[in-house]
Amino acid sequence: MRRRTTRALIAALAAMLALVVSACGSGGPSAAGDDRTIRIGAWYPLTGALASFGIPERAGADAYFKSVNARGGINGRTIDWIVKDNAYDPQQTVQIARRLVDQDRVVAIVATNGTAQSQATFPFVLEQSKVPVLNTLGGDASWYQPARDGLFGLQTLYEDQAAALGDWVARDGAKKVLVVHSDPAAFLKVAEEIGPAARKTDPSVRVKRLPVKFQTTDYSPVISKVKAEKPDAVVLILASAEAASYLKEARLQGLSTPMYGYAPVAAQSTLTLAGKAAEGVRAVQLVKSPHDDDPAIKEFRAAMAKYERGQPADFITLWGWAAAKAFVEIAKTIDGPVTAESLTRAYENARHVDTGVAPVLSFSAGRHLGTRDVQKVVVRNGRWESRGDFFTPPVRD
């Protein structure tokens, strides 16, 4: 009898030990570091073809987190932001997510990069581990319609950027609009939103699309087709390098039709590659111009110079800065431990979060995308300048 009792006790202790080891070995909602540190994580393409985005985005967010830590952190807690290189690969990103959650025990994924890459982690991070993913630099409408537990974003969707452009060209008086877009489905999906938005503003506007093979470098035949259409305005749904190729060829062929673009067009790389051909181009952006003279932008430029020397204070670094600042503004409202659960509650209760550099954000239990607003920018004297304030595009059908 004593032996059976002893064996039963040993088995019970072993089971308890297994539970303890299991709990210690995973991240999950209760992972919170200690009361002096807030441990969060992210992945970026720091190598490979997309490193030109990943490196500056990381630098912008890191500059803000460093500046907050220099001022004492979030309510006395230091931010420990763990960043790993995913080379823009979804499979690598899943493995990175497991390390961040299980080994580093982060309480959230914050200001990370990539739509497909982040989405690949959702089954493990959001659904299994219950770790929130906050302020991703990327996103898709399906992420937020309906709202998903633990997933909150702050970047206006490409489709809403297109709606803003349709409204803008119509208000500028264009009656015949040509949308030049790369041929993959992702670009077409955005281009298709311009016509309906333009016609909501002015039913007489006619919109036609001109697809271009992705990564085309010779835009001479494209410009010839544009000239033949004789549009009042051209909207570019192209990557920055291709937009620059379009602009240079348009200038070479004497095409002076007003040109508009979505946020990927409004990049420093477009100006660098296109030179004088970019003068006068209009676009929408997710943040204010980094050349603006208001205090929040000045703070950004000063912090970049102090903490991330060698990295430009441009739109891409400002995206990262805005994502980091929004997180801090919301996290500092938490009274008590900063955990996955408390962060999720804080986001659901966050209203009128103003970073000073991006649209004011508001969330709720049913609204996990904080804004639809964009900023108009125009190239003047070789640099992007803000025009007016952030505005909300027409509601899409």
Q: Model-predicted segments: where are they?
A:
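Beta-alpha junction/loop-to-helix N-cap segments that form part of ligand/metal-binding clefts
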Residues: G25-G33, S52-P56, R71-S142, V212-Y219, ...
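Extracellular/periplasmic Venus flytrap/periplasmic-binding protein
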Residues: Q92-Q95, D140-S142, D149-G254, H291-K298
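Extracytoplasmic "Venus flytrap"
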Residues: A31-G60, K84-Q91, N113-G114, V180-L188, ...
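Extracellular/periplasmic periplasmic-binding protein-like sensory domains
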Residues: L247-W321, F390-V395
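Short, low-complexity disordered leader/linker segments with a strong preference
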Residues: M1-R39, A70, V395-D397
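Periplasmic-binding protein-like
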Residues: L100-N113, P132-T136, K176-H181, K230-S240, ...
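Segments of small-molecule ligand-sensing domains
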Residues: K306-T317, V328-E385
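Signal peptide-proximal N-terminal region
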Residues: G33, I38, A59-W81, R199-P203
